[in-house]
C-alpha cells in the first residue's frame, strides 16, 4: 500500500510503476481525473467509523464519546444522524459538544449541509459513491497487488484518515484470518507512507 502525497509513484506524467514490467500488479486510485485503467478515489460516508478519526483530528473525551454513541446506535448512518440532530434515547450530550462535532465532521469530510441534510460533497467522501472502494483496495492488497493511493490533493489530516481507514480494515480482516487459521496463506502487506 503506497500513500503517495506527491503523486509520483504511479507516473501519471512521467515514468512510474505504470511502466514496470509487472504493471498488471499495480492499481492506482486518484481523486481527480483518473487516467485509463486507474480508479476514482471515493469513500462512502457509511464506511467511516469513529476510530478512523484517531490521529487525523484532536477530539475531546465528550466529542469522542458522542461519535461512538452515535455509531453504536445508528451504525452506517451515524454521521448523517449527528448532522440531522437525531437523538439517542437515554443519552444526552451538551449542545456545544454536538455543535463542535458537526462543524468538525462537515469541515474534515468536505460536506455541504443544508438544514442538517448532506446535499453535496467537495472531496473524496460521498453519500452515494464509494461504497466498495475500501473493500476493493483490501482485496487487491490481499491478492498481492501494489495499491497506490494519490493523496496529493489532501491536507495531512485527510491523508492520515485515508490510511487509517484502509489499514484498520486490513487489520480486521487479518485478525479474522488468524482466528480461523488462514493467516499463513495471506501475503504480508507493507505500507509506504511518505511525508510531503
What are these regions (language model features)?
Residues 2-196:
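P-loop NTPase motor domains
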Amino acid at each position: 500500500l503506497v500513500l503517495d502525497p506527491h503523486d509520483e509513484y504511479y507516473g501519471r506524467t512521467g515514468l512510474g510503476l505504470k511502466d514496470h514490467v509487472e504493471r498488471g500488479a499495480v492499481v492506482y486510485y486518484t481523486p481527480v481525473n483518473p487516467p485509463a485503467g486507474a480508479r476514482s478515489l471515493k469513500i462512502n460516508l457509511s464506511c467511516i467509523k469513529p476510530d478512523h478519526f484517531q490521529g487525523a483530528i484532536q477530539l475531546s473525551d465528550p466529542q469522542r464519546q458522542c461519535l461512538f454513541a452515535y455509531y453504536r446506535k445508528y451504525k452506517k448512518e451515524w454521521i448523517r444522524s449527528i448532522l440531522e440532530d437525531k437523538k439517542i434515547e437515554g443519552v444526552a450530550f451538551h449542545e456545544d459538544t454536538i455543535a463542535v462535532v458537526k462543524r468538525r465532521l462537515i469541515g474534515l469530510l468536505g460536506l455541504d449541509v443544508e438544514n442538517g441534510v448532506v446535499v453535496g460533497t467537495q472531496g473524496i467522501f460521498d453519500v452515494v459513491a464509494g461504497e466498495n472502494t475500501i473493500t476493493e483496495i483490501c482485496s487487491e492488497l490481499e491478492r498481492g497487488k501494489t495499491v497506490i493511493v494519490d493523496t496529493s490533493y489532501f491536507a495531512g489530516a485527510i491523508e492520515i484518515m485515508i490510511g487509517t481507514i484502509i489499514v484498520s480494515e486490513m487489520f480486521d480482516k487479518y485478525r479474522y484470518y488468524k482466528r480461523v487459521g488462514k493467516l499463513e496463506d495471506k501475503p504480508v502487506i507493507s505500507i509506504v507512507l511518505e511525508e510531503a
